[in-house]
Each structure stands twice: as structure tokens, then as C-alpha cells.
Amino acid sequence: MKRQKRDRLERAQSQGYKAGLNGRSHDECPYQQTEVRSYWLGGWRDARNDKLSGLCK
């Protein structure tokens, strides 16, 4: 069970990162559950920071 939960959270973080790189708004987060939403937003923030610092185009 823990592995499935971790994979789901990692997937949410990965999708958030991709959304951030593509310039999507954080308001477009598809998740309603607080824990999963926080992982998605964390990925989104990481991508925005990477993009602003010039690590990604």
C-alpha cells in the first residue's frame, strides 16, 4: 500500500513539474485531495523556479 501511495504522489509531483514548465497556472491543479494537491503544487513551484533561474527553456 505504501508503494502505491508513494507512486501516486510522485506522479502528481511530476505532472505539476510539467505543468509549471509549460507555463500553466497553479489554479489549474486537477487534484482536490490536500496531500496530492500539495505534491502537484510542489512540482509546479520547482518547475517555475527552474525556469526563472534559467535551468530550463
UniProtKB/Swiss-Prot annotation:
The listed locations are: Cytoplasm
Instruction: For the region Disordered, give the residue spans.
Output: 1-28
This protein's GO CC annotations? cytoplasm
Any one GO BP annotation for this protein: regulation of translation
Q: Which domain of life is it from?
A: Bacteria
> Keywords for this entry?
Cytoplasm, Translation regulation
Q: Name one Pfam family in it.
A: RMF
Q: Which InterPro entries match?
A: Ribosome_modulation_factor (IPR007040), RMF_sf (IPR023200)
What job does this protein perform? During stationary phase, converts 70S ribosomes to an inactive dimeric form (100S ribosomes).
Q: Which family does it belong to?
A: Belongs to the ribosome modulation factor family.
Instruction: Report what the protein is called.
Output: Ribosome modulation factor
Organism listed in the record: Vibrio cholerae serotype O1 (strain MJ-1236)
